[in-house]
Amino acid sequence: MGLMWGLFSVIIASVAQLSLGFAASHLPPMTHLWDFIAALLAFGLDARILLLGLLGYLLSVFCWYKTLHKLALSKAYALLSMSYVLVWIASMVLPGWEGTFSLKALLGVACIMSGLMLIFLPTTKQRY
């Protein structure tokens, strides 16, 4: 059950991260504070996506709280690395994100996935 909550948390956090990235690239920079505030108050699509991203992170924290009650800490924190993989893939697949493929990034993803498999593969107990 803890693994399920952890996966929910990772998926929701990944979507939230993509939402915040979209909002950050479309809203005025915070260095132009009044333009930024005006865009937020207009509550256009960019501001709504920003709000959804923030709410997504909040929901992700709830799922993470449930994860930590059910799953060993050493396994739970390893799950967080899945978010890097999901966001990398989504940035290349989703239109408008212009994520780039590189062998270096693929190697990093392979390392993350290998590490997760090592952590989550069942262990066999040896009898002596």
Curated annotation (Swiss-Prot):
Membrane topology: Multi-pass membrane protein
Gene Ontology cellular component list: plasma membrane
Positions in the Periplasmic compartment: 24-35, 98-100
Entry's induction text: Induced by BasR.
Ranges per topology, Cytoplasmic: 1-2, 57-76, 122-128
Keyword Ribosomal protein attributed: no
Major subcellular site: membrane
Gene Ontology molecular function: any one: transmembrane transporter activity
GO biological-process terms attached to the record: carbohydrate derivative transport; lipid A biosynthetic process; lipopolysaccharide biosynthetic process; response to iron(III) ion; transmembrane transport
Pathway where it operates: Bacterial outer membrane biogenesis; lipopolysaccharide biosynthesis
Membrane-spanning ranges: 3-23, 36-56, 77-97, 101-121
Swiss-Prot/TrEMBL keywords: Cell inner membrane, Cell membrane, Lipid A biosynthesis, Lipid biosynthesis, Lipid metabolism, Lipopolysaccharide biosynthesis, Membrane, Transmembrane, Transmembrane helix, Transport
Domain of life of the source: Bacteria
Gene null: resulting phenotype: Cells lacking this gene are polymyxin sensitive. Lipid A is no longer modified with L-Ara4N even though the level of the lipid-linked donor of the L-Ara4N moiety, alpha-L-Ara4N-phosphoundecaprenol, is not reduced. However, the alpha-L-Ara4N-phosphoundecaprenol is less concentrated on the periplasmic surface of the inner membrane when compared to wild-type.
Record's subcellular location: Cell inner membrane
InterPro entries: Flippase_ArnF, Small_drug/metabolite_transptr
Annotated SUPFAM superfamilies: Multidrug resistance efflux transporter EmrE (SSF103481)
PANTHER family given in the database record: 4-AMINO-4-DEOXY-L-ARABINOSE-PHOSPHOUNDECAPRENOL FLIPPASE SUBUNIT ARNF-RELATED (PTHR30561:SF9), SMR FAMILY PROTON-DEPENDENT DRUG EFFLUX TRANSPORTER SUGE (PTHR30561)
Similarity annotation: Belongs to the ArnF family.
Quaternary assembly: Heterodimer of ArnE and ArnF.
Function, in words: Translocates 4-amino-4-deoxy-L-arabinose-phosphoundecaprenol (alpha-L-Ara4N-phosphoundecaprenol) from the cytoplasmic to the periplasmic side of the inner membrane.
Cross-referenced HAMAP family: Flippase_ArnF
Protein name (database record): Probable 4-amino-4-deoxy-L-arabinose-phosphoundecaprenol flippase subunit ArnF
Gene name for this UniProt entry: arnF
